[in-house]
A protein has these predicted regions:
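Alpha-helical transmembrane segments of multi-pass membrane proteins
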Residues: 62, 66, 105-112, 176, ...
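Interfacial aromatic-anchored transmembrane helix boundaries in multi-pass membrane proteins
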Residues: 43-59, 83-118, 152-154
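Hydrophobic transmembrane alpha-helices
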Residues: 15-71, 75-76, 111-120, 183, 187
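Membrane-embedded alpha-helical hairpins and interfacial helices in multi-pass inner-membrane proteins
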Residues: 50-55, 93-102, 121-197
Length: 197
């Protein structure tokens, strides 16, 4: 079995054993793009001036993680999404580590994983792009709510459904609209530039 270039694959060697073949250029490209998306996740929240209320409305960290999942695939999206809020909290003190950065780590990891996995499984059309994007956005918010509920239980506090609804949907409406408008436009541009499939 021959390996297709551009991504790690399981290949059948002589004797029936399997091995993994990796294209060094593809790995380097993925690392560079992952670092770029991670840097954007650090920088974009600065446009809100570290004002939590504005950040909650615009959700600036969501953009590079969703893009990372689409461009690089689910595993990269998961890794960059999980790392970004935790490292940013350590470096800049924002978002606060507990419970916000921790819950965001799981939320963004879900965004990156689901968007990447779905995009690899569907036809690369604009309707399927929207379907993958919306599914990832819903999955990430559900994961965020579940983690916040667990963390609240660990500290003896409460996280009612009204708090979930406010944080996941009502407060974030401007960011949700911006994601639905801008991310497909960016992805189509990246497709035309041959940066992604």
């Amino acid at each position: 079995m021959a390996c297709k270039p551009g991504r790690p694959l399981f290949c059948l060697a002589k004797g029936g054993s399997f091995f993994i073949k990796t294209n060094p250029r593809s790995t380097t490209r993925s690392l560079v793009l992952a670092a770029l998306f991670l840097a954007l996740a650090f920088v974009l929240p600065m446009i809100t001036g570290h004002v939590p209320q504005v950040g909650n409305m615009l959700c600036p960290m969501h953009f590079p993680i969703l893009l990372c999942g689409f461009v690089l695939g689910g595993p990269w999206g998961l890794a960059v999404g999980f790392i970004a809020p935790l490292v940013r909290s350590v470096l800049f003190g924002m978002p606060p580590m507990f419970p916000i950065a921790i819950s965001m780590a799981f939320e963004l990891a879900a965004y990156g994983l689901v968007s990447g996995v779905l995009w690899r499984k569907v036809k690369h059309t604009v309707p399927m792009m929207y379907a993958s994007l919306v599914t990832a956005m819903v999955a990430g918010r559900l994961v965020w709510g579940a983690v916040r509920f667990v963390l609240a239980g660990l500290t003896g506090s409460s996280f009612p459904f009204s708090a979930f609804l406010s944080g996941a949907l009502l407060t974030a409406v401007p960011g949700i609209v911006a994601q639905l408008v801008l991310i497909p436009l960016i992805l189509v541009a990246l497709q035309k530039a041959k940066v992604m499939d």
